[in-house]
């Protein structure tokens, strides 16, 4: 597995602006705090630029989209592109909503650092057959061979952008690097917002100077390894959710956590 540099300790002055949905807002805020950064959630078009200007990274999640939120997203993304602010776009629900898919394609013009989605969402976005329903991926969409080739082509069209594709095996693709990561546990599917949290953690690592590829690999591995440490037979849903956030704050103390990343990376 490729050697990554430990991103901890985190610069505690880093502000991460999350434009996310109301369902996962609290989890993302606590997850960002657990890693040592400061979260802010502002999606009113009248103030979004003020908060984006103060931020060290921007995370855009399309959950609970509205006309007003779309306006705010476009304002923030435009500014991020102008000043080269690291930006993560999470293509939530593009399998179902033509409005969201159109918005994501517009946001590509602002050159996000990372474009994230589950297997079905990314397959839909790049024009491949998919079976996604709502905001969930389908087990029928986990084949990566055809997707990988298309993503490599897209990375040439959008240089500097990385794809983070979540699934039983997570796929990260940049212009000249590919990683297939295998940490994680099915229990993460028990609770809502864990996919959103991966996007927020990616923004955290981007704020520390990591590339899109590095930040994506670190973020998805960090959450998955944290979850692996707390899987206990018979644990209830709410207890698991609590322990996920708890472990996020503890894992960074382990200087050897990077050694537990499972998977492969290649050029």
Curated annotation (Swiss-Prot):
Under the heading CDD domains, the entry gives: THZ_kinase
Q: Which cofactor does it need?
A: Mg(2+)
Note the InterPro entries from the entry. Hyethyz_kinase, Ribokinase-like
Does the record carry Magnesium as a key word? Answer: yes
- List, in alphabetical order, the Gene Ontology terms for molecular function in this entry: ATP binding; hydroxyethylthiazole kinase activity; magnesium ion binding
> Which UniProt key words apply to this protein?
ATP-binding, Kinase, Magnesium, Metal-binding, Nucleotide-binding, Thiamine biosynthesis, Transferase
What protein name applies here? Hydroxyethylthiazole kinase 2
Species source reads: Streptococcus pneumoniae (strain Taiwan19F-14)
